Amino acid sequence: MAESQIQSYTINFGPQHPAAHGVLRLILEMSGEVVDRADPHVGLLHRGTEKLIEHKTYLQATPYFDRLDYVGTMNQEHAFVLATEKLLGIDIPIRAKFIRTLYDEIGRILNHLLNVTAFIFDVGGMTPLLYGFEEREKLMEFYERVCGARLHANYYRPGGVAADLPAGLLEDIAAWCETFPKVLDDIETLATDNRIFKQRVVDIGVVSPEQALDWGFTGPNLRASGIAWDLRKSQPYDVYDQMEFDIPVGKNGDGYDRYLVRVLEMRESVKIMKQCIAKMPGGPVRVEDNKITPPKRSEMKTSMESLIHHFKLFTEGFKVPAGEVYGAIEAPKGEFAVYLVSDGTGKPYRCKIRPPGYVHLQALDMMSKGHMLADVVANIGSIDIVFGEIDR
């Protein structure tokens, strides 16, 4: 009897595949069920964000950052307003720094909750996804109460934040911080020691520390490979230098470690949120310079100068001194950065966005070689990609 030949063929994975997490199109070259090459095709969600920003004032450019990684939105705004503030040479009030730090961590939990539970869902576990969405709903309510929007917040502004926290909000966030670890315990009970889950993700998509650095990994994907690099510790911004927290680090660099690092990061985020609430100082939430931030409504009703400031701010925007600056933050997915070039006018000359997901997606081929087709799905879930920021 003639021995059967393993047939090599090419298949399209996505862009409308439920496990593709958006509009990912993968061209998979297969030998039987084994992947020889995974070629990601990006650009299906390209909206020309960087070019649009060049035609907008700095204030009008901020909302575009919500639409990049649309899972935890305020973190992206943070990188842009930090870069703008560096160019302006201003220091924002301490209360605004605490509010930003608090909402950065809420964004981190929003992101990890979706990723961890969707990752478990990708490999066959449905229940955690329902738990995760219930908690995300509560967090989005905190977004809504502070700025009126559940997702596209546009809350951080150059010079501080858009508005102060409403009465009673901090108490409600503190109450949520007490109940949330129990939900994490429930998710971990279902997944962490689950035999089926571990068989799907342990030793799948292993990335060594050297490979992680060579490919430019950042964030949880880098830490899962055993490198304790976190911008909140190494280059602290706002009030992270006043916060006590640990950096969870994996040791195998596989899908399971990436999952564990994110779960532990959520626990650390709750710690940071509690400290922000406990230490939250009083005072203003925006710089008092009306050349940069709008005057109070009450002043505009009585003062002609305030009205002029307001009109100038929202028609031509504030002028930013010429120069270039790189502003980076530790976003939930990794190092999100903005390279901002100003030519001294009210609009950015160039705004290069450095998304973490773009780098991680490049490594998908390296991670999936020699694995089965079903493991590609597990790899996509474990590196946490969102196409808003990859395609921009």
From Swiss-Prot:
Localization of this protein: Cell inner membrane
Cited SUPFAM superfamilies: HydB/Nqo4-like
Catalytic activity: a quinone + NADH + 5 H(+)(in) = a quinol + NAD(+) + 4 H(+)(out)
Membrane topology listed for this record: Peripheral membrane protein
GO cellular component, one term: plasma membrane
InterPro entries: NADH_Q_OxRdtase_suD, NADH_UbQ_OxRdtase_49kDa_CS, NDH1_su_D/H, NiFe-Hase_large
Predominant place of localization: membrane
HAMAP family documented for this protein: NDH1_NuoD
Subunit structure: NDH-1 is composed of 14 different subunits. Subunits NuoB, C, D, E, F, and G constitute the peripheral sector of the complex.
Biological role stated in the UniProt entry: NDH-1 shuttles electrons from NADH, via FMN and iron-sulfur (Fe-S) centers, to quinones in the respiratory chain. The immediate electron acceptor for the enzyme in this species is believed to be ubiquinone. Couples the redox reaction to proton translocation (for every two electrons transferred, four hydrogen ions are translocated across the cytoplasmic membrane), and thus conserves the redox energy in a proton gradient.
Protein name per its UniProtKB record: NADH-quinone oxidoreductase subunit D
Encoding gene (name): nuoD
